[in-house]
Amino acid sequence: MESTQQMVSSIINTSFEAAVVAATSTLELMGIQYDYNEVFTRVKSKFDYVMDDSGVKNNLLGKAITIDQALNGKFGSAIRNRNWMTDSKTVAKLDEDVNKLRMTLSSKGIDQKMRVLNACFSVKRIPGKSSSIIKCTRLMKDKIERGEVEVDDSYVDEKMEIDTIDWKSRYDQLEKRFESLKQRVNEKYNTWVQKAKKVNENMYSLQNVISQQQNQIADLQQYCNKLEADLQGKFSSLVSSVEWYLRSMELPDDVKNDIEQQLNSIDLINPINAIDDIESLIRNLIQDYDRTFLMLKGLLKQCNYEYAYE
């Protein structure tokens, strides 16, 4: 029969489940998001390590096995355990282990005062209330009976004096810091406002300049359009006048046609092109006049005539 061993195993497993529940509930109360599987794995690893490394699990299971053997009529193990527990070497070993535990607690910052207070008192929470009940343990009762408890009023007064805080002084300091910060913020804000006003003024001035320049450009564009229209009209009237004058001349028809073609080729829409065309026409006329003059000059020489300009 292994009922005791099964009970011990159940208690150990229940302790592990309680540790997992305590860890997850603490994380939930603190508002920390967690992965249940990760918490379960970490707690199990730490729990198994502590139970195995400290020997607590093997100790509990060993005692459970001894109890089961005694229940089954095998008292040899129980007798050995009884003899071992009453042996002076065992007692010395237990004292040594206790001393090691005390030194370990001291190295972790848990001094004698804290250990004694934890051993003498326990705190009981009252459901639904913020207050608690302080309970004295049997050790505290024994100390009172032995006269080992005293009331130190000086310690209480000294502690109260140390914990006293001059809230008015702190409030004044915070108020001064707040006023100083408020002044700096106001100065920076006023500086930013001035800079923003200056930027707006510069922007409005630039907009006015741009508007004036746009008006001037519009006026110049209108003037250029009028000038271009006037030039187009002048060139058109010039071509018409030259054509009319050409028809009144006693020139051969082929010469008239050639000159008319050159006049009709003048671009009356673009004044720049029109000027180039007129220049080309004038050059051609001068060239024709020059050829005619050379022909006349040669003819006079062949006839033994001389010519002179008057």
From Swiss-Prot:
GO MF term set: RNA binding
Q: Which CDD domains match?
A: NSP3_rotavirus
Coiled coil stretches, renumbered:
163-234
Pfam entry (one): Rota_NSP3
Q: Where is the region Interaction with host EIF4G1?
A: 205-310
Annotated region (Dimerization) at 147-203
User: Cellular location of this protein?
Assistant: Host cytoplasm
Any idea what job this protein has? Plays an important role in stimulating the translation of viral mRNAs. These mRNAs are capped but not polyadenylated, instead terminating in a conserved sequence 'GACC' at the 3' that is recognized by NSP3, which competes with host PABPC1 for EIF4G1 binding. The interaction between NSP3 and host EIF4G1 stabilizes the EIF4E-EIF4G1 interaction, thereby facilitating the initiation of capped mRNA translation.
Query: What name is this protein filed under?
Result: Non-structural protein 3
Source organism (scientific name): Rotavirus A (strain RVA/Human/United States/M/1976/G3P[X]) (RV-A)
